[in-house]
Swiss-Prot record:
Homohexamer. Keywords: Allosteric enzyme, ATP-binding, Cytoplasm, Kinase, Nucleotide-binding, Pyrimidine biosynthesis, Transferase. This is Uridylate kinase. It is found in: Cytoplasm. UMP binds at G52, D73, T134, G135, N136, P137, Y138, F139, T140, T141. The lineage of its organism: Bacteria, Pseudomonadati, Campylobacterota, Epsilonproteobacteria, Campylobacterales. Its EC number is 2.7.4.22. The keyword Coiled coil does not apply. It catalyses: UMP + ATP = UDP + ADP. Residues 18-23 are annotated as: Involved in allosteric activation by GTP. Transmembrane segments: none annotated. HAMAP family: PyrH_B (MF_01220_B). One of its GO terms (molecular function) is UMP kinase activity.
Length: 239
C-alpha cells in the first residue's frame, strides 16, 4: 500500500498578477491548475494557501495612517478569499474537486474552516484552499501556511515563489550571493535570509515541519520535490 503523501503549497498573491503587478492573470491560474492536477494524479493530497498581495497588503494599506493596521489586515484577508475563489475556479475547470475554507465565516462564498472537515476532503482527493489567513490580524499568510500544514498533518510546506530558492543575500543586489540548498530553521530566521517571518519559522521548527522554497514557474517542480528531488530548491529543516 502506497504511503500517504500530503502537502501544503503556499503561493504568493503577487505571483498571480504576473507581469501586470496587480490583479489576477488567467494564464498563471491555468499553469497552477495543471501543476496541482499532476499532484492529484499521483495520489498526493493537496492543501493550498494563497496570499493577497496582488490586491492589497494590510501593512502597506496602514502605512499612511488613515487605515488602522487591524482594518488593513482584514482587507488583506478578504483579498485572499478573492484569490482562493479564482484558484478554485481554475482547478475545477481542469476537472478537480475543490473546496475553499475560510477562517472567517462567509457562507455565501465558501465553507468555514474546520480542521476535521478539511482532513476528510483531502482524504477524498479534493484540493482544499485555505482562505482569510488565520482569521486574525498581525499574522501573515506564511504563518497561516505553517499553521494549516500542522493542523492537517502535512508532510511538508512548499513555498512556491518567483525565485528558485534561498540565497545568503539578495541576488538582485549582490553578484556573489550564494544559493543555499539546505538550511536550518535558525538560519532561516536571519535578517538577510528571511524565508518566512519568524512566527512561521518558529512554528515549523517546533513541529519539525520541512519547508521547501522553489520556483513556481518551473514546470513539474512541485511533483519532483514531493518525489524527493530538491536539487533546484532550498529546504529548511533540522540539521
Amino acid at each position: 500500500m502506497q504511503e500517504r503523501k500530503r502537502v501544503l503549497v503556499k503561493f504568493s498573491g503577487e505571483a498571480l498578477a504576473g507581469e501586470n503587478g496587480f490583479g489576477i492573470e488567467n494564464s498563471i491560474l491555468k499553469f497552477i491548475a495543471s501543476e496541482i492536477k499532476e499532484l492529484i494524479k499521483n495520489q498526493i493530497e493537496v492543501g493550498i494557501v494563497i496570499g493577497g498581495g496582488n490586491i492589497i497588503r494590510g501593512v502597506s494599506a496602514a502605512k499612511g495612517g488613515l487605515i488602522k493596521r487591524t482594518s488593513g489586515d482584514h482587507m488583506g484577508m478578504l483579498a485572499t478569499v478573492i484569490n482562493a475563489i479564482a484558484i478554485q475556479e481554475a482547478l475545477e475547470s481542469s476537472g478537480l474537486e475543490v473546496r475553499v475554507q475560510s477562517a472567517i465565516q462567509m457562507e455565501a462564498f465558501c465553507e468555514t474552516y474546520i480542521m476535521r472537515r478539511a482532513q476528510r476532503h483531502l482524504e477524498k482527493g479534493r484540493v482544499v484552499v485555505f482562505a482569510a489567513g488565520t482569521g486574525n490580524p498581525y499574522f501573515t499568510t506564511d504563518t497561516t501556511a505553517i499553521l494549516r500544514a500542522v493542523e492537517i498533518d502535512a508532510d511538508m510546506v512548499i513555498k512556491a515563489t518567483k525565485v528558485n530558492g534561498v540565497y545568503d543575500k539578495d541576488p538582485k543586489q549582490f553578484d556573489d550571493a550564494v544559493f543555499l540548498n539546505t538550511l536550518s530553521y535558525d538560519e532561516a530566521m536571519q535578517d538577510n535570509i528571511k524565508v518566512m517571518d519568524d512566527t512561521a519559522i518558529a512554528l515549523a521548527k517546533d513541529n519539525k515541519l520541512p519547508i521547501v522554497v522553489c520556483n513556481m514557474f518551473e514546470e513539474g517542480n512541485l511533483l519532483k520535490i514531493i518525489q524527493g528531488d530538491t536539487s533546484l530548491c532550498s529546504t529548511v529543516k533540522n540539521n
